[in-house]
Amino acid sequence: MAARRIADEPAYVLHSYDWSESSLILETFTRHYGRVALVAKGAKKPTSNFRPVLLPLQPLRVTYTLGGEGHGEIHALKGAEWAGGHVMPTGDALLSGLYLNELLLRLLAREDTHAPLFDTYAGVVRVLATVDHEGEHGDALEPVLRSFELLLLREIGLLPGLDAETSTLAPLHAAARYALVPEAGLRPAVPADRAALSGGQWLALQGALDEPARYTATLRAIATAEAPVAADLKTQLRALLQYHCGSPLLRTRQLMMDLQKL
């Protein structure tokens, strides 16, 4: 029986590693099939048509057959073309994109479809490609990352509702302070909490996440928040992500922290 063939599938390369002297294993994020592992035979050869194409943060169209190389979860790449649209992000935007790739690798199960998340990711990558990390648009990175983090956590069921206390389901009071804690979800803040937001701020984020255009609405809500609010949201989301990603620390996050010390 001929192997089933998936043709012209929208995809991004999240990561690649050596399979043999001449071949690579690609971890890809596809629109209709989620995170898919592909073997790209001969991709490391100087004459391979794959070499200039199989790059991270570039929109691709891939064709592959299921169950390549005798491994059920690793499929055989047959073709890949650049889908066009934007150039590779650079500088801080490139690091930010690689950070998002690492989150997807750590948090998405293999071949679990997340088409809305794919579309959001594609939009974020387009934004990153337009950011001048040394120019006036550099400040756009933080709300872009926070918005994607929120949407990723919600898509895979790891974000509690932001309109009620997680353990009691009691509605939030707009003026009270609440902390998002990995082990307990959203709860009233205590003095020991490193960061917290007001009930009104959490409710605004929940409202944005419930909008039909949720990425745009969430981005607007975060971009217009005052600096202390954005900083506290970042602290809480990073703790939640690290909790679910496990140890060690995300490599791209560690690299960004190291560069900030230079």
Curated annotation (Swiss-Prot):
Pfam families: RecO_C, RecO_N. GO terms for biological process: DNA recombination; double-strand break repair. The keyword ATP-binding does not apply. GO terms for cellular component: bacterial nucleoid. Keywords: DNA damage, DNA recombination, DNA repair. PANTHER family: DNA REPAIR PROTEIN RECO. Belongs to the RecO family. NCBIfam families: reco. Involved in DNA repair and RecF pathway recombination. This is DNA repair protein RecO. It comes from Acidovorax sp. (strain JS42).
